[in-house]
Amino acid sequence: MKFLALALTILLAAGTQAFPMQADAPSQLEHVKAALSMYIAQVKLTAQRSIDLLDDTEYKEYKMQLTQSLDNLQQYADATSQSLAPYSEAFGTQLTDATAAVRAEVMKDVEELRSQLEPKRAELKEVLDKHIDEYRKKLEPLIKEHIELRRTEMEAFRAKMEPIVEELRAKVAINVEETKTKLMPIVEIVRAKLTERLEELRTLAAPYAEEYKEQMIKAVGEVREKVSPLSEDFKGQVGPAAEQAKQKLLAFYETISQAMKA
């Protein structure tokens, strides 16, 4: 039991001495605090697991004391971290104030470098423009020569193509006439065949047409024969009635004339 307690004590002591604090910079101090907190938490967890292995009947009181000691150690670490916070902020302020002069010197050097480099930049631009102009002068004749060569080649190609195009145009006209000459017999054959078929149809339809014509003439004659008596009868009936109506109208007119004179 004493050996276990001694081992825990040595472990905790080693843990507290494992990360010496350095005051190099605020970031370093923060790293130390974070590492110390993490290490203490791991030590507490390991020790608690070891304590849990002890028999509650025999070591109950001792387990409670060790657990309390671990809690006190955690609280001490938290209090230490909080107590270091003002020193960390103060150190950061001191560091900022201490480096103000250095930062001012750096900014001054940057401005001086900018002032010194501005003419150099103009000189560099001038040199680059000069080199580009030299390259342009070297390349421009070659480019012009290439363009002229292509233009000459195009002119030569056009000169070669013009007579061929004219020849093809003349051949097209001749070929059209030749095609027409070959096509006309085919057209005449088709036309003759169509004419023949039409004549055959006309020949086949002629008897039917004559028969239909004769039937129409016969029907018209029959209608005329049937209508003629009716027409004469109607005329005979209408004639006397029309004469009577005429006499009545003349008498009515005479009566009105006499009345107007009186």
UniProtKB/Swiss-Prot annotation:
Where do the record's region annotations for 3 X approximate tandem repeats lie? 32-63
Q: Where is this region: 10 X approximate tandem repeats?
A: 64-262
User: For this chain's UniProt record, which GO biological process terms are given?
Assistant: acylglycerol homeostasis; cholesterol efflux; cholesterol metabolic process; lipoprotein metabolic process; phospholipid efflux; response to lipopolysaccharide
Where in or outside the cell it occurs: the entry states: Secreted
Q: Which PANTHER family match?
A: APOLIPOPROTEIN, APOLIPOPROTEIN A-I
Span of the signal peptide: 1-18
Q: Which UniProt keywords apply?
A: Cholesterol metabolism, HDL, Lipid metabolism, Lipid transport, Repeat, Secreted, Signal, Steroid metabolism, Sterol metabolism, Transport
* Gene Ontology CC, one term: chylomicron
* Entry similarity comment: Belongs to the apolipoprotein A1/A4/E family.
- Major subcellular site: secreted
What is the name of this protein?
Answer: Apolipoprotein A-I-1
Q: Name one GO molecular function term.
A: cholesterol transfer activity
Which regions are annotated as sequence repeats? Answer: 64-85, 87-107, 108-118, 119-140, 141-162, 163-184, 185-206, 207-228, 229-239, 240-262
Q: Which domain of life is it from?
A: Eukaryota
Provide the disulphide bond pattern: none
Describe the task this protein carries out.
Answer: Participates in the reverse transport of cholesterol from tissues to the liver for excretion by promoting cholesterol efflux from tissues and by acting as a cofactor for the lecithin cholesterol acyltransferase (LCAT).
